[in-house]
Regions:
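Conserved residues in the N-terminal Rossmann fold of short-chain dehydrogenase/reductase
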Residues: 2, 12, 50, 239, ...
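Signature tryptophan residues that serve as conserved aromatic anchors
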Residues: 27, 31-34, 96, 102, ...
Length: 294
């Protein structure tokens, strides 16, 4: 699908005349990460669009870092809605896809009917460029800081793609040095499912996804005009009980900023990859919430 000047690989499910729902994946994932959600949503009557985001899988991966800024990514999402002929759509995202869903709803509220984030809550604009704050409070080894230097994280992550994708640890400078740590297939993936990711990232590398993180300060600069804007659409937030993101991005950061948060739940026994780890409760929450927003 040609949108916003690039080709995106997009899977479609459900009736062509159903309400449009766009599922936005995170890093290091693909549209494939929503495989447990697409059929239940389609069976409930929704037209489900599932892209590989720019820089991932079968989609184009522009070279320039600034081509992955949040306003550019949001226009990709608008292009998907335009393709579907939808004035509005519901956005559901996980990890970086959650940030993209929230920010698209924030930047273009007239195009987003409802918005859901998994693992990553909406965070209001920081008082200063966030990368400096991360360096000060979380250190140079914090994964987002470690991702900044072009080529460094790529070399470490691409050294053994299977180990990278199978590891349960957050990638950071210390992880890169610990090359002998075991990396069994995660319990929520079959070996064949893991191989889908391995094949895709062996082909594409990790640069596209890393470039999302390299725009953090640029995103801060480009969102100054909407800094005080609230997200007023019907919203949902789900996080896993064992998700490490809760330690530095708790749901409470949304207080006063997401004004119609209808669902805010912690999924027991789930970690960061909750839509793959615990699809049944995730799907139940999504379907009930979607019914409220139809």
């Amino acid at each position: 699908m040609y949108v916003n000047g690039i080709e995106l690989a997009v899977a479609e499910h459900g009736p062509a005349d159903g309400p449009v729902v766009v599922l936005l994946h995170g890093f290091p994932e693909l549209g494939f990460s929503w495989r447990h959600q697409v059929e239940p949503l389609a069976a409930a009557g929704y037209r489900v669009l599932v892209p590989d985001l720019r820089g991932f899988g079968g989609s184009d991966a522009p070279e320039a870092v600034e081509e992955y800024a949040i306003d550019v990514l949001a226009r990709d999402v608008l292009g998907l809605l335009d393709y579907a002929g939808a004035e509005q759509g519901t956005l559901i995202g996980h990890d970086w896809g959650a940030d993209l869903a929230w920010k698209t709803a924030w930047l273009y509220p007239e195009r987003v009917r409802a918005v859901a984030g998994l693992s990553v809550p909406f965070a209001p604009r920081a008082p200063a460029p966030p990368l400096g704050l991360m360096r000060k409070h979380l250190g140079e080894d914090f994964y987002i800081v470690w991702f900044q230097e072009p080529g460094v994280a790529e070399a470490a992550l691409e050294r053994d793609v299977r180990r990278t994708l199978a590891t349960a640890r957050v990638w950071d400078a210390a992880w890169a040095e610990d090359r002998d740590a075991p990396a069994p297939t995660p319990a929520f993936l079959t070996e064949a499912e893991l191989q889908v990711y391995v094949d895709a990232f062996t082909q594409s590398g990790f640069r596209g996804g890393l470039n999302y993180y390299r725009n953090i300060d640029r995103n801060w600069e480009r969102t100054a005009a909407v800094a005080e804007r609230r997200i007023t659409q019907p919203a949902l937030f789900l996080t896993g009980e064992r998700d490490p993101v809760r330690g530095f991005m708790p749901a409470a950061v949304m207080d006063g900023w997401v004004t119609d948060l209808r669902v805010n739940e912690v999924i027991p026994d789930a970690g960061h990859w909750l839509q793959q780890q615990t699809p049944e409760p995730v799907n139940a929450h999504l379907l009930a919430w979607l019914e409220l927003t139809r």
